[in-house]
Swiss-Prot record:
Any one GO BP annotation for this protein: translation
Keywords for this protein: Ribonucleoprotein, Ribosomal protein
Positions of the UniProt region annotated as Disordered: 81-110
Taxonomic path: Bacteria, Bacillati, Cyanobacteriota, Cyanophyceae, Synechococcales
GO cellular component, one term: small ribosomal subunit
Pfam families membership: Ribosomal_S16 (PF00886)
Organism: Prochlorococcus marinus (strain NATL1A)
Basic and acidic residues compositional bias, start-end: 81-104
GO molecular function, one term: structural constituent of ribosome
Family in the record: Belongs to the bacterial ribosomal protein bS16 family.
InterPro entries for the chain: Ribosomal_bS16, Ribosomal_bS16_CS, Ribosomal_bS16_dom_sf
Full protein name: Small ribosomal subunit protein bS16
Length: 110
């Protein structure tokens, strides 16, 4: 599987990243298949090769979470709102009972 990920480079404490396409089993700083862009978190500078990115996404490449946010800001992907998960049985039970109360309250008001 091809992943779109950030490859770290630069000096100590002055890092910047290259956006690369690479095999999912390769190392973080290993040899990439293709370089697709650049991101500097200090200056917020971002350069993206939009045609190459669209091609890779069309081929089924999966972006990491950090790359996904960069692509959403660049307008290449639509922003997806992920629903928050509630962990724990007690919290889930509280939510269910609250939904039931809301449903019964709306039925009685009608």
């Amino acid at each position: 599987m091809i992943k779109l990920r950030l490859k770290r480079f630069g000096k100590k404490r002055e890092t910047s990243f290259r956006l690369v396409a690479c095999n999912s089993t390769s190392r973080r700083d290993g040899r990439p298949l293709q370089e697709l862009g650049f991101y500097n978190p200090r200056t917020k500078e971002t350069r993206l090769d939009t045609e190459a990115l669209r091609t890779r996404l069309g081929q089924g490449a999966q972006p990491t979470d950090a790359v996904r946010t960069l692509l959403e800001k660049g307008g290449l992907l639509e922003k997806k709102v992920r629903p928050a998960e509630v962990l724990g049985k007690q919290k889930q039970e509280k939510e269910r009972s609250a939904k039931k109360k809301d449903a019964t309250a709306s039925e009685t008001s009608e």
